[in-house]
Structures are given as C-alpha cells and as structure tokens.
Amino acid sequence: YIEMLVDRGVAGIIFVSGRHADTTGDVTRYQRLRERGVPLVTVNGNAPTIKAPGFATDDRRATRMAVDHLIALGHQRIGLAMGPMRMVPAQRKRSGYEDAMREGLPQEPLRIVETLYTYEGGISAALHLLEQGCTGIVCSSDVMALGVVHGVRQTGRSVPHDVSVIGYDDSPLIPMTDPPLTTVRQPVGSICRAAVSTLLAQLDGERPTDTEMLFAPDLIVRDSTAAAFID
C-alpha cells in the first residue's frame, strides 16, 4: 500500500501504530521513503532504528499514574496486563509499572502478564493475575480491561469491591460500561495536531528532526477502582 501511495504522488505520510513501533520489525520501508524524499511522521511509538519525527502519549508516565492511584487506594498486590513486549508502547508501560512498584511498594514482587490487546487477552490475563493474589490490575487497553472485568467476574469476584481495574485509551463508550471504567486518557487531539503540523512543515521545506515528542496523559477516575478490601 505504501508503494501504491508513493506511485500515486502522495505528498507525505502519517504512520499510526505501525511497524515503526515494533523493535523486531523491518524498517526498510521507512528508510526507502526518506531516501526518496517523502516526508513522514509517526504516531504511537518509535523503535530505536526509526529515523523520523514521532508523536506519542507518555506511556511510562501513564502507567505510573495508574499504579500510584491504586497504591493510594491501599492496594499492594498490583498486576500489569500488557501487550507484546516487542512493541515500544508495551515496553514503556512496563517501565512505568516497574518504576511505581519499586518506589511505592518495594517489598512486593512484580506481577506482569504479557497478552494480546483483546477482550480474550484480558480474560486470560485476569485469571493469571488473580492466581497471584492481585487486588488491582492495570491494563494496556480499554478492550483488554473489559476482558479483565469479565475474568474477575468468572471467578465469583466483583469490580471494584474485590478487584480494581484500570484501562487505557478512554474510548468513547467506556463511561457507559459496567462499571464505568477508570482509565488513562490519551491526548489524541494534541498528538494529531502536532503530527499534521510537522508533516505540513516538511512539505513547506522545513528539515525534520528525528526526535519523538511525548504528550502528558490524564487519569480519568470512574467506578472500576475503589479502596482495597480488607478481610
């Protein structure tokens, strides 16, 4: 598809959540575009080998905020349901989780499950993390978090009375879930505006810098998190 776009005279390309975020991926396509003088920018994570302007949510900061919220509620056994580790956003989320746990709960082991960004992946992660005694679970996507909620209920527990769950994205329907999901809101509008303006600047002849700009997220607290239940 990329070659087709170039052959049809596309002026520039914005890549969103593509192979540019995969640390094991083939970056040849991006190198060829640069060699051909096609302006490009990326959104949602740049692997170290990618040489292009990038724009993304500060995933490390986001996950740290989520874990800190659970710690403030009295949770100690906190788990992370994350996506494939080869992806840059997953690596950053794991780093944020590790930072928060080591600073706030240094006596607790890290409880991490790598799974898919799917409802089914969330269910699987929930079952594994509940076996480890987790009372709080941070997820790498809202869809995954909904799967975690289902997995918690499969075991006869409830959210948030027994287990608190935090999502990631703040998708449009999330406030209407049962319970309404506490989640990380990405500044999508700001990221998109910056990506487009940078691409337009390249089209006007401005030389790009191969740096990545990270945007601050917000933690939106709803009803899927509560104080840790004490027997």
Where are these regions (language model features)?
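Bacterial carbohydrate/catabolite-sensing allosteric modules
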Residues: M4-G12, A21-D231
